[in-house]
């Protein structure tokens, strides 16, 4: 059974930075992403929806820039789930907010674990656009993930989600 790929691969007019698709987001966080249609699914919804199925795969055939955005989202969800294990909703919210905003490596920098799969930004301006898009992406993903992980109880995270925190998608971590 193959891994699930992004449904946004067929979009042709999506801007890219490096070779990451800067897909529209349904978000209230500031950043360079275009606003998505509220009635449609965006890449954040897709990352959350496909996470549990895709996290079991060690190999993932990249078919386009939207798949690279999906991979980044899947790896970020894994990191988030590792951080919220055992925390109540308020503490998890603070933890994930600081995780989303902390300094992180982008493709092309020495600390980025997926440099073999991602192209570096072409210029310093492109690097800044990539960093701000990924920051906006991380903030929105962390915010929406909390509503899934704490859907039933606010005292502790759902075991249905945290059981996936030890799984390594593609044997990688951010």
From Swiss-Prot:
GO molecular function, one term: actin filament binding
InterPro entries: ARPC3 (IPR007204), ARPC3_sf (IPR036753)
Cross-referenced Pfam families: P21-Arc (PF04062)
Gene Ontology annotations for the cellular component aspect, listed alphabetically: actin cortical patch; Arp2/3 protein complex; cell division site; cell tip; cytosol; nucleus
Cell wall biogenesis/degradation keyword on record: no
Subcellular location: Cytoplasm, Cytoskeleton, Actin patch
Alphabetical list of Gene3D superfamilies matching this protein: Actin-related protein 2/3 complex subunit 3
Gene Ontology biological-process annotations: actin cortical patch assembly; actin cortical patch organization; actin filament branching; Arp2/3 complex-mediated actin nucleation; endocytosis; establishment or maintenance of cell polarity; regulation of actin filament polymerization
Alphabetized UniProt keyword annotations: Actin-binding, Cytoplasm, Cytoskeleton
Disulfide bonds: none
Record's keyword annotation contains Protease: no
Function in brief: Functions as a component of the Arp2/3 complex which is involved in regulation of actin polymerization and together with an activating nucleation-promoting factor (NPF) mediates the formation of branched actin networks.
Stated family: Belongs to the ARPC3 family.
Oligomer status and interactors: Component of the Arp2/3 complex composed of arp2, act2, arc1/p41-ARC, arc2/p34-ARC, arc3/p21-ARC, arc4/p20-ARC and arc5/p16-ARC.
PANTHER family in the cross-refs: ARP2/3 COMPLEX 21 KD SUBUNIT
Name listed for the protein in its UniProt record: Actin-related protein 2/3 complex subunit 3
Organism of provenance: Schizosaccharomyces pombe (strain 972 / ATCC 24843)
Lineage: Eukaryota, Fungi, Dikarya, Ascomycota, Taphrinomycotina
């Amino acid at each position: 059974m193959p891994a699930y790929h992004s449904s946004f691969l067929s979009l042709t007019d999506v801007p890219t930075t490096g070779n990451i698709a800067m897909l529209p987001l349904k978000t209230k966080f500031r950043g360079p992403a275009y606003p998505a249609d509220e009635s449609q699914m965006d890449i954040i919804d897709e990352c959350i929806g496909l996470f549990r199925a895709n996290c079991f795969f060690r190999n993932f055939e990249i078919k386009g820039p939207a798949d690279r955005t999906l991979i980044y989202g899947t790896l970020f969800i894994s990191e988030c789930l590792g951080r919220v294990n055992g925390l109540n909703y308020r503490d998890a919210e603070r933890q994930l907010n600081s995780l989303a905003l902390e300094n992180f490596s982008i493709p092309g920098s020495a600390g980025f674990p997926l440099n073999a799969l991602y192209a570096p930004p072409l210029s310093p301006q492109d690097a800044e656009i990539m960093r701000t898009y990924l920051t906006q992406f991380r903030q929105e993903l962390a915010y929406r993930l909390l509503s899934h992980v704490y859907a039933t109880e606010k005292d502790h995270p759902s075991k249905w989600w945290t059981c996936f925190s030890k799984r390594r998608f593609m044997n990688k971590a951010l």
